[in-house]
Amino acid sequence: MSTEGPQQPMLVAGLTQSKKLIKVGMASSAFIAKDADAKIINLVAELCRVNNVKCDMAKTKKELGIMCGIDVDCAVCVTLN
């Protein structure tokens, strides 16, 4: 019997990678920082709507970067299927 708990979903950070993964159907959900540029917010939200991907807003780019385990701010990230 395995003693491991449920695995955390894999996060991929960054606009370019996130857009690609949403378009090819590999993203299960997307997170967008509320303080991201309006063009980015609108672009990713529309991609998610068109491709049936759940889209949530994160508080800040800094917090999203921390959530992704990176040392820089992050405007967008996705979880993989």
Which role fits each region the language model picked out?
Residues 31-32:
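Alpha-helical transmembrane segments of helical membrane proteins, especially in multi-pass transport
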Residues 47:
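Hydrophobic/aromatic ligand-binding patch that stacks against planar heteroaromatic rings
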Residues 17, 28, 68, 72:
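Short, flexible micro-motifs
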Residues 50-81:
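Short basic, glycine-rich beta-strand/loop surfaces that mediate nucleic-acid
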Residues 35-36, 59:
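Short beta->alpha linker loops
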Residues 44:
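Aromatic/hydrophobic pocket-lining residues that form π-stacking "cages" and hydrophobic walls in ligand
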Residues 40-41:
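Short, glycine/polar-rich helix-capping loops at beta-to-alpha or helix-loop-helix junctions
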Residues 1-26, 37:
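Ribosome large-subunit tunnel/peptidyl-transferase-proximal elements
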